[in-house]
């Protein structure tokens, strides 16, 4: 019995060490177990494919650009990709310096699918931001230097749901005041996905504002009998994104393989667009992951004929968050 307990304790410690190394701030043992095993208890939004005009066997895909508003470089690349249809959706960081340009773009292009990349972390070394709310009204979200916390772990450890809801609502309100009519919300760095109380706050803000909430399948482990999936939450069956262990030389191969192996259901490819220019190099200094070269590679791939051909050859149906919003609300 003693050795069984010691073995169990060792396993638990190993799991949480793994989470810590990989910046997965899950501190609930039940959620941690479900996250590792992939066990989840939920039903997808009923008849989603049919209501979008397709069948359950169809491969539905959103090609989504994150981090709009971060910089001029990101905006220029993302706006061009959206106008050309290289991506068909994107989301905006309302805490950043270039959101006025996004407001102007949204007003001139009201048909384009733009959501909000709800931001509660400030990860760059030399480019910091605080919340949209007055910092004194969201003290649990702000570090000692007056910025949002630099990583998900510190945010998850310190944030309380009331402060979080206040800030998320402020970001939505600011977007609307700039003429942006958001179609959905998602989470910068996935920071809202790990603690159940904070995740609930995220879902509540979406429902209160009639905005679809991005919930990828691995995050659906939160749902169970004690916390059933809200009826208006649509689960993204498969999410794809280049990760830090991907070699730059394998960029094209990775994305084409995703398209060639895409399965039925709702899928989302997330890209981070920008130019490998001085502005992005300065912002992402000492941070090659999601850095300037990374963003230019993402742009190059989605602009390629090979990428477009793979979409066509695999009979992939492009859908948007606006279409999903129109169905559920």
Model-derived segments and spans:
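C-terminal domain-boundary segment and adjacent tail
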Residues: 213-216, 287-329
């Amino acid at each position: 019995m003693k050795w069984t307990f010691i073995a169990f304790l060792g396993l638990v410690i190993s799991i949480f060490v793994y989470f810590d190394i990989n910046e997965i701030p899950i501190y609930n043992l039940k959620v941690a177990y479900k996250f590792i095993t992939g066990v989840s208890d939920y039903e997808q939004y009923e008849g989603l494919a049919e209501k979008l005009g397709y069948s359950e066997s169809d491969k539905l895909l959103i090609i989504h650009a994150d981090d709009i508003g971060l910089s001029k470089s990101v905006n220029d690349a993302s706006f061009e990709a959206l106008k050309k249809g290289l991506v068909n959706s994107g989301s905006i960081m309302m805490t950043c310096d270039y959101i006025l340009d996004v407001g102007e773009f949204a007003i001139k292009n009201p048909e384009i699918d733009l959501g909000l990349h709800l931001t509660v972390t400030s990860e760059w070394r030399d480019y910091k931001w605080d919340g949209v709310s007055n910092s004194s009204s969201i003290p649990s979200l702000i570090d000692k230097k007056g910025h949002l916390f630099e990583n998900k772990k510190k945010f998850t450890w310190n944030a309380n749901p009331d402060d979080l809801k206040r800030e998320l609502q402020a970001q939505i309100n600011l977007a609307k005041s700039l003429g942006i009519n958001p179609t959905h919300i998602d989470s910068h760095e996935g920071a809202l996905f790990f603690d159940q109380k904070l995740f609930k706050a995220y879902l509540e803000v979406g429902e209160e504002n009639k905005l679809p909430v991005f919930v990828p399948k691995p995050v659906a482990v939160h749902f169970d009998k004690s916390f059933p999936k809200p009826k208006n939450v649509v689960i993204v069956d498969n999410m794809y994104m280049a990760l830090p262990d991907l070699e730059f030389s394998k960029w094209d191969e990775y994305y084409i393989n995703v398209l060639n192996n895409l399965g039925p259901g709702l899928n989302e490819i997330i890209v981070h667009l920008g130019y490998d220019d001085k502005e992005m190099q300065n912002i992402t200094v000492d941070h090659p992951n999601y850095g300037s070269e990374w963003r230019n590679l993402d742009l190059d791939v989605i602009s390629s004929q090979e990428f477009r051909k793979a979409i066509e050859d695999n009979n992939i149906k492009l859908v948007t968050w606006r279409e999903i919003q129109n169905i559920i609300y």
